[in-house]
């Protein structure tokens, strides 16, 4: 996927549900949501959980996969798995507000920022910096790169064109 994705978790996200929420770029959860990687409880493996090492601390990751015990939305927020918590009735509004905040950014810059984050989890620091620079060249040389500072100086919202 080239566009940012947002998971909205209301209820339980166990096993495959966790996998889907983890695969998204951002995650909003209701305050009643629960998360668990339960594979050890049923004799299965969870190789899909490997990218968590780039999302949460190693010992917390280890506890989650070794015990299979659920964690609350609050705990998921504390360890960095969840970006925002909302009341169940406000979950979708909260997720949509986050989406609107992302959409306020220049499209090419948002895409480059997302690509930089993804690349930095796949390579070493020096290579990630080089790749990040390459990812941002298009954004820096775009019409939007001219529009952003101009709109700022004119105290107005930018009119992004995505080019």
Q: Predicted regions: what is each one?
A:
Residues 55, 70, 85:
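Short aromatic/basic micro-patch
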Residues 4, 21, 76, 113, ...:
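Terminal peptide-recognition signature
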Residues 28-33, 82-130, 137, 143, ...:
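C-terminal long alpha-helix characteristic of the crotonase
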Residues 64-65, 113-116, 132, 152:
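Short alpha-helical scaffolding segments that buttress acidic/His motifs in well-ordered protein cores
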Residues 1-7:
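Conserved catalytic cysteine-centered active-site region
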Residues 8, 14-66, 78-79, 94, ...:
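CoA-thioester-processing core
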